[in-house]
């Protein structure tokens, strides 16, 4: 299929793109599943308390079962004693399994989200950036001109290195390369911006 391509002067052209990425089936259930797994795997479960079986110390009873008049107790490792284990406390990162995210799931979810952006006219493709953008002021004027104030800009690695600094202080705009964006990024921003080179890399990676 063909979609519009713009240059920085605003002139319109077209570019041939893969249907399987830009006109894919929108699978919202799959996207939700990918987001759930990604979010679960991002969580840093650093809090950890010792369970009763992890406490170092004697396992002998603290006093006899009968004859003391007190309640029955086993060892001092019990959660009711100071220095004992913690009942139902956080178990730390190793106790939780990472949810497996298949490559095919990731590819199909990205294709679904890009297709949705395309259908909503929130997908913009530019010709490759040369050395036109060197300052934040220049980048800001381009963002304002093309109404991409809330956008994820996905570039090839060399282009990203050129303009990354010029975008750093502009709010609600993120610049990344083709290897470092996720379904979360696409959903977070209203518009997604590609260049001709990043489209080619995307098609190699996700086709």
UniProtKB/Swiss-Prot annotation:
> What are the protein's UniProt keywords?
Ribonucleoprotein, Ribosomal protein, RNA-binding, rRNA-binding
Is RNA-binding among this UniProt entry's keywords?
A: yes
Q: Which GO terms describe its biological process?
A: translation
* Cellular-component GO terms for this entry: ribonucleoprotein complex; ribosome
Please name the GO terms that the record assigns under molecular function: rRNA binding; structural constituent of ribosome
Presence of the UniProt keyword Ribonucleoprotein in the record:
yes
Q: Which Gene3D superfamilies match?
A: 3.40.1370.10
Q: Which Pfam families did the record assign?
A: Ribosomal_L4
User: Into which family does the record put it?
Assistant: Belongs to the universal ribosomal protein uL4 family.
**NCBIfam families reported for this sequence:** rplD_bact (TIGR03953)
What does the UniProt record say this protein does? One of the primary rRNA binding proteins, this protein initially binds near the 5'-end of the 23S rRNA. It is important during the early stages of 50S assembly. It makes multiple contacts with different domains of the 23S rRNA in the assembled 50S subunit and ribosome.
Give the record's subunit note.
Part of the 50S ribosomal subunit.
- Tell me what this protein is called: Large ribosomal subunit protein uL4
Q: Taxonomically, what lineage is the organism?
A: Bacteria, Pseudomonadati, Pseudomonadota, Alphaproteobacteria, Candidatus Pelagibacterales
